[in-house]
Every structure is written in structure tokens, then in C-alpha cells.
Amino acid sequence: MSKPHLIIAAGGTGGHMFPAQALSEAMLRKGWRVTLSTDARGARYVGGFSHAVEIREVSSATFTRGGALAKLAVPFRIFGGVLTATARMLREKPDVVVGFGGYPTIPAMAAARLTGRPRMLHEQNGVLGRVNRVFAKHVAHVACGTWPTDVPLGADAIHTGNPVRAAIVERGGAPYTPPGDWPMSLLVFGGSQGARILSDVVPAAIALLPEAIRDLLRIAQQAREEDVDRVQAAYDDLSMRVEVDTFLHDMPRRLSEAQLVICRSGASSVADINVVGRPAIYVPLAIAVRDEQTANARGPVDAGAAVLMPESQLTPETLAQTIEQILTQPDAATQMSIAALSVAVPDATERLVALVETLAAPTPQET
């Protein structure tokens, strides 16, 4: 008897690919055959996928890149990808197709609809991406990593959470050491490529803190390569113990040891912080077209687990005030930690697996 076959469509950014990777690993353990459908850009992120996953590069494109001629070619490239994917699906008849967003998912999701294969989406952010919004009403379920998520009327939204790495799950609910008269860890990061505004504002905010607090802080801050030296110099002027680098290794350990986290509110970052259970100050990316990072932070902020600080309000003075407020109120900080755990979904991968298995029916869904 042949193995059940899952096609995962994802690409564009690590935000789409990492949860797709988590699902692929879980389905392989369940004995499924797994195929990843992505484009050349998404293929840069496949290094973490198991060698047992078949990688298929499809023809796709985005209207957000390139000049006028490149944009004119986009529909033709996508159409070619859809034709190829449709022909393959007619031959293979996959049991389930799951899209994780991004333009590279268009060929597989369109082909799944045309051939009537069971299909669903996973949306990482609190606002549907462009491609997921197109397909949301034409799939069985929209699995939502962030809750609530803004979905079109008629779409079946289900809260599954965002899958997190096994190393994060292992640190889930690690005992929180509240701030006090002992060394305190402050973790600062800005996503996959850092955030210049955090490099500008955080060191200046730390300089405004009372010396008694500064003397207790141990700071690890991610920064862009071009910002590392100046950020380090700013802390050196304060004679502080800091680690500034373009990439912070062993994030699960760093999260579990932190008294406070300051970061962007990307979907995966929020999920990781909630699962470990740490107080956070979120600075959403202001240029995000759909303001999805503000939506991502809504759950923990409403629960009392985090403080939302839009870029328009982020100054050394406002940030210093917020940091001091959290680090001088240990009981309140502990409650923030507990609140983060209350909105965490450590079993997000298992929830996705359950949906896939439910969809794996012998008859195709209606189109």
C-alpha cells in the first residue's frame, strides 16, 4: 500500500518556510510522503528540511519585485507554474495540499482547486497575506497561527497557533526568575536581519536608566552588520556587559534566561516568546503593508503579557520608562510571564497534523 501523499506549498521568506518545515517533519514521522512546492527564492530556505522531503521548484513570481518588464512577465510565469502543477496533480492525486503563503504557493494551490484535491491554508500572521486571502474561501480550513486573524467572510478559520522549534518547546514554561537585586538578562533582536531602529534607540534608552539597574543588566542584542560596532561602542561608553552580534546563537536558552525581551513582533518571534513565557516589549515593523506585526502582538498585549510600542512612539525616553517599570516590579513581571503562557500554543504542529489527517479523505472536496 502506497504512503499517503502531502504537498506543502510555501516560499518567499523564512516566515513561511519554517512552519512548513515543522509540518513536514511531523508528517514524515507519521509515515507520509511529503513534497515541498516552492520557487527558486524559497529554495534558499530548504536546508533545514529532511532529505526525505522531495523539493520541487515551480515557476512563480511576485508583482512586488523588479521593473516594468519583470512585472509584465509575472502572469505568464505563474500561469506556466499552474499548468505544470496541475498536470502533476492529475497524475499523482495527492491526499492533501497545504499552502503556507507567499507567491510560490499559487501554482500548487490553484492546481489543487482545479483538480479538486483536499486543501487548506496556514496563515502565520494576524492579517492574511495577499495569496492566502485569494484562496481562503476555496479551501476546507484556514489554520491561523495568530488569534484572532482577519479572514474573509465564509472562510473556516481555526486557531492552530504557529509551530515552534522542538528546542523552544523543550524550554516551554521554563521557570521565570523575576527581576530583582541580582543580574538580569535583557534580550534584544529585530528578526532575521535585525532592526536599525532598535540599534538606534535601545542603547540610548539603557543610558537613561538608573545606574543601579544598569549595573545589574546583562544585554544580548542582535544588530545589522553595519550597526554592530556603533552599538557596541554605545554600550562600552556605559561600561556594561553586553553581547552584540548579527546572529544570536542558542535563542531558546537566551529566551528562557531573559527577564525581558525587546523585539519586532514577527509571528514566529511572538510564538517563541509566548511558549517560553517571557515579558516582552514589541516594536511592530511600521512599513508592513497590512500592519500584520501589530496584529501579531494583539493577543499577548491584550492578555497583559507584553507592551506594544509603535515606532512612532519609540524614543529613548519612552523605552527607558517602560523598561524601568517592568524591571522594578517583579510581581507584575511574573504576571506578564504567566500571561504569555496563557496565550501560547506549544502543540501547534500537532494541531496542524490533526487537520491534515482529517482532510485525507478518499473523495475530493467540492470546488
From Swiss-Prot:
Gene3D superfamilies: Glycogen Phosphorylase B. Pfam families: Glyco_tran_28_C, Glyco_transf_28. It is a peripheral membrane protein. GO terms for molecular function: UDP-N-acetyl-D-glucosamine:N-acetylmuramoyl-L-alanyl-D-glutamyl-meso-2,6-diaminopimelyl-D-alanyl-D-alanine-diphosphoundecaprenol 4-beta-N-acetylglucosaminlytransferase activity; undecaprenyldiphospho-muramoylpentapeptide beta-N-acetylglucosaminyltransferase activity. Transmembrane segments: none annotated. InterPro entries: GlcNAc_MurG, Glyco_trans_28_C, GlycoTrans_28_N. GO terms for cellular component: plasma membrane. Its EC number is 2.4.1.227. UDP-N-acetyl-alpha-D-glucosamine binds at T13, G14, G15, N125, R165, S192, Q293. Pathway: Cell wall biogenesis; peptidoglycan biosynthesis. Its main location: membrane. It catalyses: di-trans,octa-cis-undecaprenyl diphospho-N-acetyl-alpha-D-muramoyl-L-alanyl-D-glutamyl-meso-2,6-diaminopimeloyl-D-alanyl-D-alanine + UDP-N-acetyl-alpha-D-glucosamine = di-trans,octa-cis-undecaprenyl diphospho-[N-acetyl-alpha-D-glucosaminyl-(1->4)]-N-acetyl-alpha-D-muramoyl-L-alanyl-D-glutamyl-meso-2,6-diaminopimeloyl-D-alanyl-D-alanine + UDP + H(+). Keywords: Cell cycle, Cell division, Cell inner membrane, Cell membrane, Cell shape, Cell wall biogenesis/degradation, Glycosyltransferase, Membrane, Peptidoglycan synthesis, Transferase. Cell wall formation. Catalyzes the transfer of a GlcNAc subunit on undecaprenyl-pyrophosphoryl-MurNAc-pentapeptide (lipid intermediate I) to form undecaprenyl-pyrophosphoryl-MurNAc-(pentapeptide)GlcNAc (lipid intermediate II). Belongs to the glycosyltransferase 28 family. MurG subfamily. This is UDP-N-acetylglucosamine--N-acetylmuramyl-(pentapeptide) pyrophosphoryl-undecaprenol N-acetylglucosamine transferase. The gene is murG.
